[in-house]
Amino acid sequence: MTAFPDVPVIQYEGPQSDNPLAFRWYNPDEVIEGKTMKDHMRFSIVYWHTFRGTGADPFGPGTAVRPWDNGSESVENAQKRAVVAFELFTKLQAPYYAWHDRDVAPEGANLRETHANLDAVADVLEEQQKATGVKLLWGTANMFSNPRFMHGAATSCNADVFAYAGAQVKKALEVTKRLGGENYVFWGGREGYQNLYNTDMKRELDHLAKFFHMAVDYAKSIGFDGQFLIEPKPKEPTKHQYDSDAAACMNFLRAYDLDSHFKLNIETNHATLAGHTMMHELDYAGIQGGLGSIDANTGDLLLGWDTDQFPTDYYLTTQTMLMILKHGGIGTGGVNFDAKVRRESFEPIDLFHAHIGGMDAFAKGLKIAAAIRASGELADFVKNRYSTWDSGIGAKIEAGEVGFAELEAYMLEKGDVDANQSGRQEYLEHMINKYIDRV
């Protein structure tokens, strides 16, 4: 029995369509820069916000109307929920989905029962994947909700908690492999500290690295060849998280000899909380060879927390796709909608409106970014801005042919620097508007 009887499979109808249950910009088979939109985006829908979010907040209970969910933490309810999830995935033409272990299956009375619960729901997930063709983008373990993780998981001061976390990730890796997951994500929501008075940061970082090495070793032992990803976030729920931004993560990975095994899953709202733009985080990760996937959402600049709103801003999606195209795409990663409908958007149909809007925004962002790249206008401006490095003293500096003594001699002879040129920021911002207008 269908959970969404009034919703057809969402189709592309073009920019002039007034149908709210149609794509205006996302045409899966349209080829952009030699790849289809579907292959550029690899759209993914998250299980947690979409099927476990209730609309609850600190000031009131949930508002979401979900007729298929009886509200129980039973395996049977979880299995029923899984069938409904795949109806939504297929009607949105989303090729991927993503989960935390506790999203898809309830925690049991003990670890053995918890594992059995996950296996029972994985049976249904596997059946649904085979029936629909929808694939698992990535799995991960929820090591932040249960009170046992109050001090962290891999960074906990309690060695038993580290051990429990290891057992949980072991199982999550096994199920991710079973379901053909193409990546595995670590997000350290509790991996950090509230106060340094009671914290041995060095020991915690060492433990975190040891945990990741254990994950790499176990993945090899079971033949899981998916990409490991770390998702940066500076705070919330912890005051200071160790995976605070792309730079901190890449430094950590290099310091502990993990950089050949891990890339980054960059989220827009997390970049905002870290005081960065999404463009910055993507460019930095790409420069360092660490761009693996993205969590697509947006935050509210007037609020100081992770609001996980659906992305509908063409400037944001254009900037995001400019960086993804610049760095050669996202490989086995995807554009994963880690976003939730607002508390006031409580009806099932709102799930479709939200995802259609996000998918369309990214599709148009891709087209705009491709148009900017095809014209060469932005690239030529940047190249010309750095032209003094292409010859003369600039080329010698980059080639390592001169040191401070030679630089001093050069300037003593020259007398003063050549005049600087304008950065033309306003011109470039207006230029980007031109492409947004024309696509």
Curated annotation (Swiss-Prot):
Q: What is its EC number?
A: 5.3.1.5
Q: State any GO CC term.
A: cytoplasm
Give the cofactors, semicolon-separated. Mg(2+)
Residues the record lists as binding Mg(2+) 2:
E267, H270, D306, D308
Q: Where in the cell is it found?
A: Cytoplasm
In Pfam terms, one family for this protein is AP_endonuc_2
Query: From which domain of life does this come?
Result: Bacteria
Signal peptide span: none
Give the cofactor note: Binds 2 magnesium ions per subunit.
InterPro entries found in the cross-reference section:
Xyl_isomerase-like_sf (IPR036237), Xyl_isomerase-like_TIM-brl (IPR013022), Xylose_isom_bac (IPR013452), Xylose_isomerase (IPR001998)
A single Gene Ontology MF term assigned here is: magnesium ion binding
By sequence similarity, the record places it as follows:
Belongs to the xylose isomerase family.
Q: What is this protein called?
A: Xylose isomerase
Originating organism: Rhodopirellula baltica (strain DSM 10527 / NCIMB 13988 / SH1)
Gene name of the encoded protein: xylA
